[in-house]
Amino acid sequence: MTVLAAFDSQTGILMVGHGSREPDGNEPLLELCRGVEKRLGITPVQPCYLELTRPTIDEGLSSLYRRGVERAIVVPLQLTAGRHVRYDIPCEVGKSLAKLSNMFVCFTNHLGAHSTLVDMADSRLAEALADQPPVAGSTQYVLVARGSRDPLVRGEVFRLAQIRQFMGCIEEFTPCFLAMAEPTFEDCLKTAVSRNPTRIVVQPYLLYPGRLLNRIRGTVAKLAAEYPHIEWVTADALGPDDRLVNCVVDLAKEAQEQDFHRQLV
């Protein structure tokens, strides 16, 4: 169980999701916030989104400020430390703090930095294969992430694929991307097919179900129709998962051991 000793009513947590135009795509973050708030008791927890929907980061910090919060712990709920984590979120926080006197902040690591995410990925893969009988031939494993032009993001995904490969005693777990980076998802699947496997397993590196997971499943369905002799398996997104509450609390506790400051633009 995570230790909660240092949290109080004047220290709030701002949980920053990406945001979706589809209301159903934003509900998992709200549910996660309710779980974190229940765990922490008197500590205010506020959801917000970087883009596409509300509340915005500015609205989220302002809400915490009105609730008497003097110190805000900002938790980026992103799986990789791309531009959103390193620039966009701090920039928006800085703009907001310029209007909020006497509020200080600290930033946690992004969600994907928590080691439990690897365990969650392992759980989703095990669930996807639970009802599948063993196959006599070879299996190709594909890890597909959002994608970014940022080489650091690409490196994170490649490292995760290596960890998954090692933990699962899998010969090869091939990383690929939906956009803005190579290898692309489509090219990776074509390569997997060319190796004439008995089964192809696709693991989406996505936090929650939504438009991108539907896109992945659609691509797999088309190829399954084209190559019916191959067994195709697609795992679910990482969440919802009760362990995400522990991840957020762990990251927040680690971050608050740093100094709070005013992050101004």
Predicted regions and their residues:
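Active-site-proximal alpha-helix that buttresses catalytic centers in soluble enzyme cores
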Residues: M1-V265
